[in-house]
Every structure is written in structure tokens, then in C-alpha cells.
Amino acid sequence: MVFCVVSKGMPGRVELPECDIAVFGFGGLGEVDYEKELKGESEKFEEAARLSQKLNCGLVCGCKTLSRGLLRKSVAVADRGKLMGISDMNHVLDGEQFKSGVGLGFYKVNGCKIGLCIENDLMFPDTFKALSLCGCNAVIVVMEEIKDGIPPLLIRAYSYLYGVPVVLCGGRTACFADVSGAIATSVQDVTLFEICPQNKYHIVTTRTRGISSDIKSDY
């Protein structure tokens, strides 16, 4: 499974190598107004879907969506001509101007089960734990930019702990972490990461108090 991370350029305006899933950051679609999309005044989501059909691959694009005055950080997902859905960032920190979304982004794209993590959601481990339990083959993280070394550190830890490879697109930087704890970083305009999905499980036992196994005769 080959992921192509585009750190510079917009869908349709950059030459892409052959890949299974192409990932664009927040510069991919820019700001998308739902009302204009519905009225046909803009066709950004449709253009993304058409491009995925042209390239015969999945397409993951960061964007900011506007709906009735509410601004959200979102990711649009298309698969070979079909718009699969739009997922929103769930966690808004310290009075940011954005509105929080609800639910996890989980899609089957080009035969691969991918989970989405958007910007602030990276700071919350439950996001990755839930996506791992859902059976994701990979998690894609989309951020506006990587300001320090924390995001690469986190994706490395999450990939190792939860057994899911992670691809990160953050501004001009692309990162990849696999389940072994290895990490790769690139500042090229276009970067390819190859993932071999694995489903390795461990039997983990624990002891706890309570949950009595005694059968009561007066039940």
C-alpha cells in the first residue's frame, strides 16, 4: 500500500506518482463553503472526487469548512470518483475560532481501512486507541504545520503502542511511523511511503477486584 503525501501543491495542479492513496494538507482545498457547494457555486469536493477517479486512487484532502457561520477544520475523503465523506476535528483548544466536530473518521479507501486524525485530535490518545480497535490498516494525520518535535514523537509512540502505521501531513513536512517504532521524515514537495498492513495481536491478561462469579440462589 503506497501513500503519497503532497506537502506543496493543490489537487490537480501537481504531478503525482502512482500510488494507492494521495494525501494533501490544508492547502489542498482551502476553505470550502457548504452552502456554495450545494448551490453549485463552487465544486471543490466534486473536483477532488473527479481527480481521484482520474488518478484511480484514494484522495485525502485537508480543508476548512464553513457552515452557517461555523468554521471547522476538516478532511475530505474520495475514492476513485466517489466522495466518501468529510470528517471534522473533534477537539478545539483554548478558545480557538473553530467549532468541534463529532465522531471518528473511518473509511475504506482503495481496499485499505484508514482512520483520520485532524490537528488537535493528535493530542488525545483515545483517538488512536479507538481507530486501532476498529481495525484500521493505517491512520492519516493532517495538520496545518508542525511547529515542534511533539507531533512526530506522538505518532511514533501511538504507532508502536497501538500497532497501526501512521502517515502525517503537516505543512511542508511529511512523516511516517511504523509499528516497530521506526520513523521517517521528509520535506520534499511529494513523498512516497509504503505500508505493509499487519494485524499482530498479543494476549494480555490482568487481575481485578469485583465482578463476583458466585451464583446467588435468590436471583
List the predicted regions and their residue ranges.
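Structural signal for conserved beta-strand scaffold positions within catalytic alpha/beta enzyme cores
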Residues: 5, 61, 88, 116, ...
